């Protein structure tokens, strides 16, 4: 439903998550909650935020579509800052193998894993990838996600990487959600470069990066920096080349073993370092010092039955922590934002306040958009969600249940 002016009034809580940059350490506990609050928006932009009586004194309420939210909490739209939602095929057999005890890396080493999805994605046409991608965006949108990051990395050649990124660009134009695109050509080494990882990195740098940049639709470059995949030196070489082409930088770091990926991300001042299940204490300190967002993916640790990233230690050390789904066909075939929040609180020892911050303003910072989205602040885009309950604390408490009642995206109203 479209309306140029919307007023949410008498909300049990307006959870503002105020600010225009990532919140670090103890700052993550400050949600800026307004009780009996109101939010006014016009032409897709937030114009007034505050106690209901104050907002009503400053607007002509009769000009607005009113939503009375006496028993509802109102939050910024969620930002899912790490996904791989465009892919062909599925890997349900590999999930069964992992249940029998096979490790993620052992499956990858014998031709499964990412290369398995690469084959299916290369065989998929644009329309099929688009249709499946739209379905996944719809699922995320229904759970309150208004901005999503999506990675390529299942083509591992120029042609298919471009197809993945063009699908994301097209969905960004056609779907209510915003899609922030990331080039992840260095996700694995394809069979045609087996045993020649340095040559593959050269190919990425010399041929693929310039062609991706020419598309003018891709914001980030990412790399899977991991033992047995891309070394620290190879990762740094690729990321420095990407920066030369004016990409912002991300890293998959320290997911499988302690590898020094977080330290590299800090030295390169990446926007975010992601996964971090096996980050070192030194890596934590350097991420905090460098201001790199630590994007943690509890659904993946759950799906792989691996130890969770040390969120509590990171926050206490002054890191800015974000949470994301890591939706992908292999290590985490789930987009369950509600389950992710519960896992973060129960197993990673994050408080409900920290989890909300991690999925809003810090998620926005992880995609370089904290000045536009991620908080209910005057001048920001009108990306707002209403819950079915009167407090944000129901998010981890009502485990695994979708509590989103209404989504407002760019000032347009969607009833879930």
Swiss-Prot record:
Q: Which reaction does it catalyse?
A: 4-imidazolone-5-propanoate + H2O = N-formimidoyl-L-glutamate
Q: What is this protein called?
A: Imidazolonepropionase
Q: Does the keyword DNA repair apply?
A: no
Q: Which NCBIfam families match?
A: hutI (TIGR01224)
Give the Enzyme Commission number.
3.5.2.7
Q: Which GO terms describe its biological process?
A: L-histidine catabolic process to glutamate and formamide; L-histidine catabolic process to glutamate and formate
Corresponding gene? Answer: hutI
Its keywords, alphabetically, are: Cytoplasm, Histidine metabolism, Hydrolase, Iron, Metal-binding, Zinc
Q: Which top-level group of life is the source organism from?
A: Bacteria
């Amino acid at each position: 439903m479209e309306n140029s002016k919307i007023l949410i009034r008498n909300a049990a809580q307006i959870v503002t998550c105020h600010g225009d940059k990532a919140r670090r350490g103890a700052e993550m506990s400050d949600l800026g909650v307004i009780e009996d609050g109101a939010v006014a928006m016009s032409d897709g932009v937030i114009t007034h935020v505050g106690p209901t009586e104050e907002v009503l004194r400053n607007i002509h309420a009769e000009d607005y579509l009113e939503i009375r939210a006496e028993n509802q909490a109102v939050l910024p739209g969620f930002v899912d800052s790490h996904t791989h939602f465009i892919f062909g095929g599925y890997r349900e057999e590999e999930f069964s193998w992992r249940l029998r005890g096979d490790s993620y890396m052992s499956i990858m080493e014998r031709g499964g894993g990412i290369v398995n999805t690469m084959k299916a994605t290369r065989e998929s046409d644009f329309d099929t990838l688009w249709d499946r991608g739209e379905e996944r965006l719809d699922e995320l949108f229904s759970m309150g996600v208004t901005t999503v990051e999506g990675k390529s990395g299942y083509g591992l050649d120029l042609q298919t990487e471009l197809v993945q990124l063009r699908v994301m660009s097209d969905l960004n134009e056609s779907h209510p959600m915003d899609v922030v695109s990331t080039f992840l050509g260095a996700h694995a080494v394809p069979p045609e470069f087996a045993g020649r990882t340095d040559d593959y990195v050269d190919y990425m740098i010399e041929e693929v990066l310039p062609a991706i940049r020419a598309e003018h639709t891709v914001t980030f470059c990412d790399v899977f920096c991991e033992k047995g995949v891309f070394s620290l030196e190879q990762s740094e070489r690729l990321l420095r080349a990407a920066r030369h082409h004016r990409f912002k930088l991300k890293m998959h770091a320290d997911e499988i073993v302690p590898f020094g990926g977080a330290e590299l991300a800090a030295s390169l001042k990446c926007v975010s370092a992601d996964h971090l299940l096996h980050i070192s204490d030194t890596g934590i300190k350097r991420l905090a010092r460098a201001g790199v967002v630590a994007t943690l993916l509890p659904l993946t640790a759950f799906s792989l039955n691996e130890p969770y990233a040390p969120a509590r230690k990171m926050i206490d050390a002054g890191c800015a922590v974000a949470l994301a789904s890591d939706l992908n066909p292999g290590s985490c075939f789930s987009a369950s934002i509600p389950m992710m929040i519960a896992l973060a609180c129960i197993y990673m020892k994050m408080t409900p306040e920290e989890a909300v911050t991690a999925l809003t303003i810090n998620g926005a910072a992880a995609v370089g958009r904290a000045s536009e989205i991620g908080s209910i602040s005057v001048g920001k885009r009108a990306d707002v969600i209403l819950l079915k309950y009167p407090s944000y604390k129901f998010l981890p408490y009502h485990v695994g249940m979708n509590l989103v009642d209404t989504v407002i995206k760019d000032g347009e109203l969607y009833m879930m």
